[in-house]
Amino acid sequence: MSIAIAGFLMGLSLIVAIGPQNALIIRQGIKREGLIPILVVCILSDVILIFGGTAGVGALVDRAPIALVVLKWLGVAYLLYFGFTCFKEAFKRHGQALAVEQSEPVAYEPVADASSGVITKTRTKAQPKSAQRTWVKPVLAALAFTWLNPAAYIDVLVMLGGIANQHGPDGRWVFALGALCASLTWFPFIGYTSTRFSTVLSRPAVWRYINIAIGIIMMIMCARLIMH
């Protein structure tokens, strides 16, 4: 049990700090768009990284520094792009600001009355063309923030995997499960907490400051990547 708790605390220490992943989850939780797919991507990515590191894949990453350099600059480019979109959304006019609670769109469909032969229009719920695709961009962002981030490979594959292997052949997997429980707890917590308070947080003035804060976080993470 103590090994699992150690793994949980280690995993929590790596993901609690506000970084690109957490910022994205909070942002989409407030918007109520694509939250579940993002949580699935983040958790499955951690499953791969944590168990890959525990299995010893981190040693391969340590021997391929050029791969980390390529990932570094791809990550820098994406962080700059995402930060720009946050600043752009922050400075939209109030009329274009996020609205979480909107009335459902409706459409009118012609319906023929069999007895009178008169055609009337019936009010039905309209299906937005892009409604089923709102999760695509956030999911791609989650994938980019995870797999184009060299820190994910160093912190999880190399460092966490190395610490896990100090607990022996059996104990290392208990440690890994503890670390995974941290991801299973933290990501849904911040996502659904953001959704719970989305009515307040999505007000134009608040949403503007949130976007500015996330944009600044992206720029800080970008600078950290460049300097490492």
Swiss-Prot record:
GO terms for cellular component: plasma membrane. The chain crosses the membrane at residues 4-26, 38-60, 65-87, 139-161, 171-193, 205-227. Its main location: membrane. Pfam families: LysE. Keywords: Amino-acid transport, Cell inner membrane, Cell membrane, Membrane, Transmembrane, Transmembrane helix, Transport. It is a multi-pass membrane protein. It is found in: Cell inner membrane. GO terms for molecular function: amino acid transmembrane transporter activity. The keyword Cell inner membrane applies. Belongs to the LysE/ArgO transporter (TC 2.A.75) family. Catalyzes the efflux of L-lysine. This is Lysine exporter LysE. The lineage of its organism: Bacteria, Bacillati, Actinomycetota, Actinomycetes, Mycobacteriales. The gene is lysE.
